């Protein structure tokens, strides 16, 4: 037993490390090959593997650096998770939307794959099961921009209520879909099927209104996706960000410890971002202060 232990102890000094280094080298080669030759597919798999929004945002920035577009959700293209389209772009998945459940996602994708793309919002509400895709799901889809592929309406129109009416555009659309599905079910159950004189329900007219501002649109997007998809609030300040020597928050966090220790005394650093959280704290001497948490485009 002593001899076996001594032999294995000496063997383990090199065999264990070499075997692991070989395996890691092989995995690294596979990863590099996939990223170089199948960048869209590789990065969509990486995004699907991430468990929190900060890591997803980080890898979306990597996609941007690689020249790969990450597009918002689309009712005629999105799958459950991130997926690559025919152009090599990555499409945001319906599974990442708050308020859209598993049954709704399955119903939307299954119907689309079976009977083709949805022609417009009215075709959509006629075809999907409203027991699965309820009003809450529809609201989240609108907020996320999933219906932007239907150019007839912009997002604000779905929530606009005309003076003197009690329902907004989306509620009119939902009611239309319910009536059409009821008529379809009733016709199917008749002895002779669909009759030439079957009732026709006209599509409701959705009143025009002003579109949302960029800030409103982005805030709604972030509410349901966890991130800004169509742009960024700092897009209003592109000139300032470009010409005022702005330091990214990520870089500033890397060097701030050195600044505290006295390095680069007299040098000024400018950062620009959105304050996403503010914590109110108290010092040991009972002085109140606030600690903001800013975020820029790269964080």
Per-segment meaning from a language model:
Residues 1-291, 295-297:
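Noncatalytic, beta-rich nucleic-acid-contacting surfaces in large DNA/RNA-processing enzymes
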């Amino acid at each position: 037993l002593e001899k076996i232990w001594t032999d294995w102890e000496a063997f383990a000094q090199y065999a264990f490390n070499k075997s692991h280094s070989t395996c890691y080298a092989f995995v690294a080669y596979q990863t590099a090959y996939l990223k170089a030759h199948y960048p869209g597919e590789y990065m969509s798999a990486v995004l699907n593997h991430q468990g929190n929004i900060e890591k997803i945002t980080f890898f979306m920035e990597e996609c941007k650096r690689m020249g790969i577009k990450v597009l918002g959700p689309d009712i005629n293209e999105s799958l459950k998770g991130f997926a690559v389209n025919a152009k090599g772009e990555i499409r945001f998945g319906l599974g990442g939307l708050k308020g859209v459940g598993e049954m709704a996602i399955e119903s939307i994708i299954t119907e689309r794959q079976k009977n083709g793309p949805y022609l417009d919002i009215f075709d959509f509400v006629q075809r999907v099961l409203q027991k699965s895709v309820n009003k809450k799901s529809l609201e989240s889809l609108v907020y996320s921009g999933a219906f932007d592929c239907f150019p007839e309406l912009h997002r604000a129109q779905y929530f606009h209520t005309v003076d003197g009416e009690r329902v907004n555009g989306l509620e009119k659309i939902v009611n239309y879909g319910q009536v059409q599905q009821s008529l379809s079910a009733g016709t199917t159950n008749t002895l002779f099927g669909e009759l030439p004189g079957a009732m026709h329900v006209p599509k409701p007219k959705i009143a025009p209104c002003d579109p949302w501002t960029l800030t409103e649109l982005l805030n709604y997007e972030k509410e349901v996706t966890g991130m800004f998809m169509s742009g960024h609030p700092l897009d209003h300040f592109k000139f300032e960000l470009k010409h005022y020597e702005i330091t990214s928050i990520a870089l500033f966090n890397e060097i701030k410890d050195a600044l505290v220790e006295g390095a680069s005394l007299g040098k000024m650093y400018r950062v620009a971002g959105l304050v996403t959280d503010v914590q109110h704290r108290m010092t040991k001497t009972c002085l109140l202060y606030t600690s903001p948490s800013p975020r820029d485009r790269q964080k």
